[in-house]
Amino acid sequence: NKKGVPCITVSKTPNTSSFNEQGINKIVITKQDILKSGAIDINDVLKLIPGLDIFQSGQMGQQTSIFSRGSESNHTLVLLNGIAINDQSTTDGLHDFGQDFIQTIQQVEIYKGSNGAHFGPSAIAGAINFITDIDYINTYSVSGFNFKNNSFDTNYTKINDNNWHLNFKGSVVQSETDSAIAKGNENDGARNFQINLNAIKWINENLKFKSTLYSRNTKADYDGSASNETG
């Protein structure tokens, strides 16, 4: 400078490297992979991954825990778009995978073991990241074998005059299976409702604003005891 005072020059250099290019291995399951697998809930997808042990306490929608490489279930960090969503209302911060259905999920990233270390100490056994990014193909889908087992999901995206990218995803899944009690007459079912809103706006070539809203509600039937079908 003109006065000869020492100063520090700060310059920016874009970092184009990604985690997997820095020696971190992750398994990516795309929307196309999910559709090809015929999966209904996230458990159907994760069962395809070696090294993940899935324990479900009943039919679809019941409490489900995942154990990775012999570690406790709460040692696996669960994220939504990079934000931790483990249930902190429980003692160990467990995540119930039985509540997760895949109709509004765009991609699943799985980091096993030390590959999840960059997420912090909560990811001792690894991390699972659910991505609900914008899908620019407007679709809707209805499927059902009968009135007791059916699903509906839709995706709609619009780019307005102010260059806002607005996206809505919604889904409803209903499944009624056989009774958990042998020779029982009551169907124990599950109903899942999901809404996902995404908004993106590019401020300039290197900066963008991104916001997401995700809501889910799962109700599952269960039997009170081995002789009582009401739960």
Predicted segment positions?
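Short, acidic, small-residue-rich periplasmic hinge/interaction motif at the N-terminus
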Residues: 1-35, 73
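Transmembrane beta-barrel architecture of outer-membrane proteins
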Residues: 37, 63, 95, 123-125, ...
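Outer-membrane beta-barrel domain signature
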Residues: 55, 95, 115-119, 141-143, ...
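Solvent-exposed loop/turn segments connecting transmembrane beta-strands
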Residues: 58, 120-122, 142-153
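Short acidic/polar hinge/loop motifs at secondary-structure boundaries
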Residues: 65, 84-112
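A beta-strand signature from Gram-negative outer-membrane beta-barrel systems
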Residues: 99-139
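Periplasmic-side early beta-strands and strand-to-turn transitions of outer-membrane beta-barrels
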Residues: 129, 136-138, 151, 155-231
